[in-house]
Amino acid sequence: MKDRIKKLQKEKDVAILAHYYVDGEVQEIADYVGDSFYLAKTATKLKNKTIIMAGVYFMGESIKILNPEKMVHMVDIYADCPMAHMITIKKIKEMREKYDDLAVVCYINSTAEIKAYCDVCITSSNAVKIVSKLKEKNIFIVPDGNLASYITKQVKNKNIILNKGYCCVHNLVHLENVIKLKNEYPNARVLAHPECKEEILNLADYIGSTSGIIEEVLKDGNEFIIVTERGIQHKIYEKAPNKKLYFADTLICKSMKKNTLEKIEKILLDGGDELEVNDEIAKKALIPLEKMLELAGD
């Protein structure tokens, strides 16, 4: 099937992008694999007129907003991120009325409608850098409260206001499981994603995005306790097969696992449904996405 997909892809001039959390076999046929920020940046540089996104819905939306002239397909249109819906436009409007000198910062894990009401987007790989550069004193970060809490510790000259959203995978990591792994493997370093709760991050030797965690594993050291979605192991073992990884809890995103080779082949054969974003919303949502790319500077 992989050979058929690559043949069809070449014939139809289609670029396949995949997030680190999708199954390894999907990552293997993708042209580009990375975290949310890398995929958003990469999409703006592609010459292909059609993009297939193996990830969750907000990723495809962001790519379509940044590339309105391209045809964008989700591998599974129902692969959604629950956290993206854990903030409302009403709440954002209330915060703008309550605070002067306020910037509304949205994690890229948000809907296009929410982005349209925000000032700048962030990802876990550039959040601290971007928030540090904002001129506003008050910063309302949506929708992820755990990421916002982490940023609060890193950017101390801002009044960061937290929302109550969370990642359904990272938020369920059990503290006792991480402690147990640390006791079992005392030489292993703990690498955690900032979507985890503070009690988990307090045990981490390194906190960073999926790309950051991979880079950290590829440095010195042989044993690592990984506190993020298990799909990340595919890229790590591809680059460093002898590293020993120990995962805290199950850590599987069911939405990411909806992306399959069968669905990709079907899109290449039949066309599939094109992802569309309302023109007015897309125009407004483009502003925070472009500001993110500008402030991230890489």
UniProtKB/Swiss-Prot annotation:
Name the record gives this protein: Quinolinate synthase
SUPFAM superfamilies: NadA-like
Pathway(s) this gene product operates in, as recorded in its UniProt entry: Cofactor biosynthesis; NAD(+) biosynthesis; quinolinate from iminoaspartate: step 1/1
Cofactor binding: number and manner: Binds 1 [4Fe-4S] cluster per subunit.
Keyword annotations from UniProtKB, A to Z: 4Fe-4S, Cytoplasm, Iron, Iron-sulfur, Metal-binding, Pyridine nucleotide biosynthesis, Transferase
Binding site for [4Fe-4S] cluster: 81, 167, 253
BP GO annotations: 'de novo' NAD biosynthetic process from L-aspartate
Record EC number: 2.5.1.72
Function: Catalyzes the condensation of iminoaspartate with dihydroxyacetone phosphate to form quinolinate.
Record localization: Cytoplasm
Cofactor: [4Fe-4S] cluster
One GO MF term attached to the UniProt entry: metal ion binding
Superkingdom as given in the UniProt entry: Bacteria
Provenance organism: Fusobacterium nucleatum subsp. nucleatum (strain ATCC 25586 / DSM 15643 / BCRC 10681 / CIP 101130 / JCM 8532 / KCTC 2640 / LMG 13131 / VPI 4355)
